[in-house]
Amino acid sequence: MTSRIIALICVAAWSAPAAAAPASHAPMRPLPTASDRPLGAGPAYHVDPVNGDAASDGSAKKPWKTVDAAVKRLKPGDTLYLHGGTYFESVTLAVAGTAKAPITIRAVPGELAIIDGGLREFEEAPKAAWEPVKGGAPGEFRSVREFATIRKDSDGGRGVWVLGNFADSMVPLHGYRFEVDLRTDNQLWNVPDNVTPGAGIYVGPGVWFDWETHRIHVRLAHTQVAGQPDNYAGETDPRKLALVIGVDRSALRLDKAAYVRIQDLVLRGSATRTLEIEGSHDVELDGVTIYGGSPAVYVGSTHHLRLVRSVVRGTAAPWSSRASMKYRGNSPYLVIAGSKPPQSHDWELAYDEFTDGHDGIVVDSLKGLAFHHNRIDNFNDDGIYLTLPPRASVPEGIRIYENLVTRVYTALAFAEADDRSANPIGPGVYLYRNVFDLRDGTYGWIPKDAAGAATLSPSRMCGDHGSPTWEPLFFYHNTVINPGSAFRDYYGEQMVMGTKGTKRRLFNNVFIQVDGNPGLHVPGPNDDVMADGNLLWGMRTGPGFQGDFFAKRKARPGPDGFGAHDVFADPRLAHLVDGEPVLDLRPRGGGVVDAGVAVPTEWPDSLRAADRGKPDIGALPLGAPMLQVGPTAAPKR
């Protein structure tokens, strides 16, 4: 599936120099490139994966060999420079700088440094690392070497112990749960049960770990599924390709680290947590590229964390479906804020990209989060989890603003505890000035038979698993574009679902529906829900509608004053045309301008000062610049 070109919202992209076409598949995203960040001041040490030596003094002319050994020598104020190349290590950082003299680990300017927790031979010597499997499937290979030290409990209960990527494109390899899936030629969803092996279903290039022989198996056979977003047609012999193969170790662990800065590094090569941070504080990651991993990032009991100008990529390949990941492989979250005490607090995730996975970001137990100017794109299940019990803490002081969300099956997600017990909730989550462009869906299901079609699931604004009590939501000054009718014709593109036992406020939002008109089903009169000043519009059917659009809603009992100042009108945005991918949500005048209602001044609003006169409706007030998200949209260093 090709993402829309949101040309007039400034989506910051990472540029890469022209290169030969990969032997595997075209990259899903621009590959990381070297940074031009200038050298810093203060004591400096160097490490080089090719020319380094453990017996050296760590100077620029005599660098050390490994990062893990080098970081143990660092003192407050030191900077460790990583020269270009791949460091096949699992690095543990357990050092502390000070507020005035932090410790910095970074790449040398102009050189791309990669910390790879994976297995070296599959990248550097693939011809000698793989052997054909006797009696196996066509194109099936296994590792020449045994890996008997992989921990059985490292799979997180999913039955997947190995993950990987094509090294030339970083397109993910499927982590197979079932041996029969790797070996079958069947590519249709005709298995007897979603999680029963049956005769198997091959879902794309991938890896599988054989616990009897302790060998890693790989198969890179082509896919030929009609109607799915893409198919694999690249090299099928793993001896001719470099593969990143991750097992049960992280690329980088921060253990009780403090006042540490990580800059301009690439982290990859793990089937568990690519980046793990535990019990740390005052940590900043800037310009980092992280490839999942299950998950890509895990952070527990850590305060004053910043992740800025960075990209985090998940494990979904172009041919990965929600079903293939959820039922026949691994279905990891991308980023997890662990909920065990002590509670993590005071985080900022800004100007980042979070892309290409099954589930996205779990932030349901943090105290103090500024999540802004990020791009969230291409998750075939849930995007941002705001309720995911069990948890030792509830969210507090969560601000999600000025983000762009696209191609997510469920943008905002809420889940019930496994034992279905009641979950506590926090004081409320603030979501404002975001753009949810949900016109494009995600890949849901593989066809069941040759006559069937691949199922592309429409993106939706919100949803839940079970019947949890949703976090209180303060949702205001957002712009939401949905492809079609909301579930049960709910008002606000489903934003009035799950209102029992919680609080919901919806003010000054634009809800646009491409096909049909927005829903009007509202909660009962006893729910603590207030909505007002919202603009609703149907792109195709709105212009021809006659009469009182809200008559149906007015005829049904609902909360007092619900939608009293809502409008049904063309929002008159700079560029929003049916069938065209480009998007510019700046107001042209009229429509959303001065049409909103007053929002409590104690609610945060990053663009309040730019909204002159009466409140405008939607993410951008009249005269505001384009929404800018992603790494290169960040303020200059």
Where are these predicted regions, by residue range?
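Short beta->alpha connector loops
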Residues: 85-87, 270, 290-293, 366
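Extracellular polysaccharide-degrading/modifying enzymes targeting complex plant/algal/animal polysaccharides
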Residues: 23-270, 276, 319-329, 585-589, ...
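Positively charged n-region of N-terminal signal peptides that target proteins for export
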Residues: 1-4
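Glycine- and acidic/polar-rich repeat regions and solenoidal domains
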Residues: 251-253, 272-276, 294-300, 304, ...
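Bacterial N-terminal signal peptides
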Residues: 6-16
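Extracellular beta-helix/beta-solenoid repeat scaffolds
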Residues: 101, 106, 110, 115, ...
